[in-house]
């Protein structure tokens, strides 16, 4: 495969993963508020995959979706969300909250999708309440 084709495949898999995550969130009672939001127009890195309202907890949820073909025995959960990505997510979420004048409760979740389009039922792992300020380079879960 050529590098350009690999990029297209990666983009398609990412879009598929986001669609799977949206479906998952809706089935679990979340209302989708925004998708692929770029609250800072001048900075393409600042993107929020999904913004959803959790009716059960009355809080806004900023969701980062990570799609993998299959689980790796060598990778820990959340490993693909590195320090730079966490920093960009924090900035994007703060910008979204300012732009939408959101003053209520909020949290950050990561949804990991294991599977590929047409490859059967994907495995979905939702990690809630992820802290974007890592301690010693590692993620910390609040709950």
Residues covered by each model-derived region:
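Conserved catalytic cores of phosphodiester-cleaving nucleases, focusing on short active-site segments
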Residues: 48-72, 89
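A short acidic/basic microdomain associated with nuclease active sites
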Residues: 26-43
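Short, conserved glycine- and acidic-residue-centered signature motifs
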Residues: 14, 18, 44, 81-85
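Interdomain/boundary linker segments immediately adjacent to catalytic/signaling cores
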Residues: 1-23
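Short beta-strand or tight-loop elements
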Residues: 29, 46-49, 106
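Catalytic cores of nucleic-acid endonucleases
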Residues: 67-117
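Protein kinase-like catalytic core scaffold
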Residues: 46, 59-61, 109, 125
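Domain-level recognition of nuclease-like catalytic cores that cleave nucleotide substrates
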Residues: 99-143
């Amino acid at each position: 495969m050529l590098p350009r084709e690999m990029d297209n495949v990666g983009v398609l898999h990412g879009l598929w993963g986001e669609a799977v995550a949206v479906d998952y969130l809706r089935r679990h009672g979340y209302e989708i508020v925004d998708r692929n939001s770029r609250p800072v127009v001048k900075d393409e890195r600042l993107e929020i995959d999904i913004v959803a309202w959790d009716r059960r907890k009355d809080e806004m949820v900023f969701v980062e979706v990570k799609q993998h073909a299959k689980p790796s025995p060598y990778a820990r959960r959340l490993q693909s969300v590195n320090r730079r990505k966490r920093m960009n997510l924090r900035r994007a979420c703060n910008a979204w909250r300012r732009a939408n004048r959101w003053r209520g409760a909020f949290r950050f979740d990561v949804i990991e999708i294991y599977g590929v389009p047409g490859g059967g039922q994907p495995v979905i792992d939702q990690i809630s309440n992820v802290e974007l300020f890592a301690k010693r380079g590692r993620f910390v879960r609040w709950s």
